[in-house]
Regions:
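Conserved catalytic core of the tyrosine transesterase superfamily
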Residues: 1-159
Length: 159
């Protein structure tokens, strides 16, 4: 288009070119047995294992995107209605149902999350954020991916 505007050429020589189609990769998925192994991989004897199990339960139980998960606040969860309010793509609010295992895992995590602060285990820098890192701040999408990879290895799911 630049050469046409400058009068160097009259016709765009690329108009009749056909671009090659790039095959899309199929998304990575887990079978039910593998999902169960993954969710059971975090140790429930350590505080971050409890947090990580809650993360995995919510990811599996709701189908929430990682970017949405890291932006969750405690107030986004309605335990009575068994739902999570999510601010999704394009700032659109979505309501996702919570499974009973997800609710139990979140509740157990929240009990332990409060104990962390009492024991000065972490500083609560982000009191509203649902899932905290070891410094008391909001987890990032990258840290969630690291958590998933860590437990996939522990569960023997190295595909």
């Amino acid at each position: 288009n630049l050469f046409i505007k400058k009068g160097i050429i009259e016709v765009n020589p690329t108009l009749n070119l056909i671009t090659p189609k790039i095959n899309k990769k199929l998304p990575y998925f887990l079978y039910l047995q593998e999902v169960n192994k993954l969710i059971e991989a975090p140790s429930q004897k350590i505080p971050f294992g409890i947090r990580d199990k809650a993360i995995l339960e919510v990811l599996y139980g709701t189908g929430i995107r990682v970017g949405e998960l890291v932006n969750l606040n405690i107030g986004d969860i309605d335990f009575n209605e068994k739902i999570i309010r999510v601010l999704g793509k394009g700032s659109k609010e979505r309501i996702l149902p919570l499974s009973n295992p997800s609710i139990r895992a979140i509740q157990e995590y929240l009990v332990n999350r409060n104990l962390f602060n009492k024991n000065k285990f972490i500083k609560m820098n982000d009191k509203d954020s649902l899932f905290l890192n070891r410094f008391g701040g909001r987890l990032t999408a990258r840290s969630i991916r690291r958590i998933i990879i860590k437990y996939m290895k522990i569960a023997g799911l190295n595909r």
